[in-house]
Swiss-Prot record:
Keyword field: Cell cycle, Cell division, Centromere, Chromosome, Coiled coil, Kinetochore, Mitosis, Nucleus
Record-given protein name: Probable kinetochore protein SPC24
GO biological process, one term: cell division
Location in the cell: Nucleus; Chromosome, Centromere, Kinetochore
Domain of life: Eukaryota
Role played: Acts as a component of the essential kinetochore-associated NDC80 complex, which is required for chromosome segregation and spindle checkpoint activity.
Entry similarity comment: Belongs to the SPC24 family.
One cellular-component annotation, GO: Ndc80 complex
Keyword Coiled coil carried by entry: yes
Ranges in coiled-coil conformation: 24-124
Lineage: Eukaryota, Fungi, Dikarya, Ascomycota, Saccharomycotina
Subunit (UniProt): Component of the NDC80 complex, which consists of NDC80, NUF2, SPC24 and SPC25.
Length: 189
């Protein structure tokens, strides 16, 4: 207890336990480190705040773009639906299928008609050759050959000979020469 009663001794003993200069130096260094850490933390906080602002700005721009795209998509969807409703696509598809069937039927009908014409021509040719064999084998004269050639020429020009008049078959069968003329049609050629 004597130590407690002697304050000077107590101070000396306490001083001997601590190195005050070293502790003061350590405290100054700790304060300096704390200031540097505080400054570094403030810089990092400022950097992070700026980065957050940039990211929030980018996020807001992206959200605006997304909203615009959603709105555009909805408008296009409604426009497509309107066009589909106006066009009535299923009915158009049915109409197109029906037209294709009709075209195929017409094609078949035309093909059958062509086959009938070919068969009829073959029969007529066979009948003509049979008739030619049955007719007396008289030599065909030069005038007859000329007349046949003229008739073939008229036919190739879509012109027909009817009651001694040339008829233009391309224009509603009207006469090529006046009906009042009494000259021979063969003379016109």
């Amino acid at each position: 207890m004597s130590r407690l009663n002697d304050p000077v001794e107590l101070l000396q003993q306490t001083r001997s336990n601590f190195i005050i200069e070293s502790d003061v130096s350590n405290i100054k260094e700790i304060k300096s480190n704390m200031r540097q850490l505080t400054k570094l933390m403030a810089e990092k906080q400022t950097h992070h705040n700026e980065l957050m602002k940039q990211l929030q700005s980018q996020l807001q721009r992206q959200q605006t773009k997304v909203q615009a795209l959603k709105k555009n998509f909805q408008e296009q969807t409604s426009q497509v639906k309107r066009v589909e409703d106006e066009l009535n696509i299923p009915k158009l598809q049915q109409d197109i299928d029906k037209l294709v069937q009709e075209i195929n039927q017409l094609r078949d009908t035309i093909q059958e008609g062509i086959q009938k014409v070919v068969e009829t021509q073959k029969q007529l040719l066979n009948d003509d050759t049979d008739a030619a064999h049955t007719i007396d084998e008289e030599p065909i004269g030069k005038d007859d050959k000329i007349r046949v050639l003229k008739l073939k020429l008229f036919h190739s020009l879509d012109v027909a000979l009817y009651n001694d008049q040339l008829l233009d078959l391309r224009n509603e069968a009207r006469p090529l020469s006046s009906s009042s003329s009494s000259h021979n049609i063969w003379d016109e050629l």
